Amino acid sequence: MIYKFYDTCSLLLNYQHLFEEEGVRVAISSITLQELEEIKSSFRKDAEIKFSARKLLHVLEDNRYKYDLLVYKPAMLARLFETHVFEETNDMKILACAFHYDTYVHPDETVFVTNDLALQTSANLYFGEDSITSVKLG
């Protein structure tokens, strides 16, 4: 089994095919759910991205037993700060959840999925390049 821990943007890009891969278990952070809630009601987001966020939330609800939800706790972020200095952002909280999932839930079986280059660079410090996947359009 492969465990793929998705950040928010990679989920939005990939939700149509999220649960189609055989032998893959999806994992997300509670921070991702918060971000999706904010996106779907934000006056700063365009209609297409808001629709995608709504659709993704429905896909997650319809498949609620097919993914793991890791609830963010501040102690998770503190572990990242022990070795590197970062700003406390939602991306870093998502990364902290993914690192916790990889360390305590499915050690060395987790692939972190992101299309955010800055987050990918930070994730490389904890996961290594072979455990990070980038989501691309098309």
Regions found by a protein language model. Give the residues of each.
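Active-site-proximal, substrate-binding regions of enzyme catalytic domains
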Residues: M1-V111, N115-G138
